[in-house]
Amino acid sequence: DGRVNVWVGLEHLFYADKAGQQRAIDMAKKHGTGFHTHCSEAEIEVAEFEKRYGKRPMFALEDLGFFETPRAMIAHAVWLDPSEVDLIAGRTVSVAHNPVSNMKLASGIAPIADMLAAGIPVGIGTDGEKENNNFDMFEEMKVASLLGKLKDRDAAAMDSWDVLRMATIGGAKAVGLDHEIGSIEVGKRADIVAVRADTPRMTPF
């Protein structure tokens, strides 16, 4: 019924050697599926990429054919530099922003505003349970907004609408399903959440 989509994924590319990475990427291309991996999560990871491949992570992924898959998703992308943001902009590459996990693991603050400005689809995720302690998407939305403000040192940055878009249509675009879900439109699936606003915890709404 179209509710299940299968992607190929390596949680971290370092969990496989180069041959294994290549096989996984080739599998995604062969079967026409998306490919997902965690990348540029920690600063030490970037250093390891440069040691192994002689270049930053996104450029190493380009050499492996990661961007030639039908759709590629990168979780975290905390340590992307401007050249990497430019590289993935305009390609079928998206980012899963995991703000609470990035705080818990002291990974850093992802340059989300730069990615959005470059037109890169960004959705909001939670990462795994041990990296987060819960799967509360409303908490993720709040923290995404707060971290965006802290990153830019601007209280007006990453406002509620920016975060709501990432949590809805942004996430749908990130997985290539924005034609089906992510916004309330005629012909789309009724992917709707109702929230009570008449409770103390929802004040000032």
Language-model regions: role of each:
Residues D1-S94, A106-V122, E139-K142, H179:
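Histidine/acidic residue-rich metal-binding segments in metalloenzymes
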Residues F14-Y15, A75, N102-M103, M158-D159, ...:
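Residue-level marker of alpha-helix boundaries and capping positions
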Residues E41, P99-M103, G128-K130:
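Short, acidic/turn-prone active-site loops that include or flank metal/cofactor-
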Residues D63-T69, A113-T199:
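His/Asp/Glu-enriched, well-ordered alpha-helical/loop segment
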Residues V78, P99-V100, D198:
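Short glycine-/small-residue-rich Rossmann-like dinucleotide-binding loops
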Residues P200-F205:
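Short, surface-exposed loop/helix-turn segments at secondary-structure junctions
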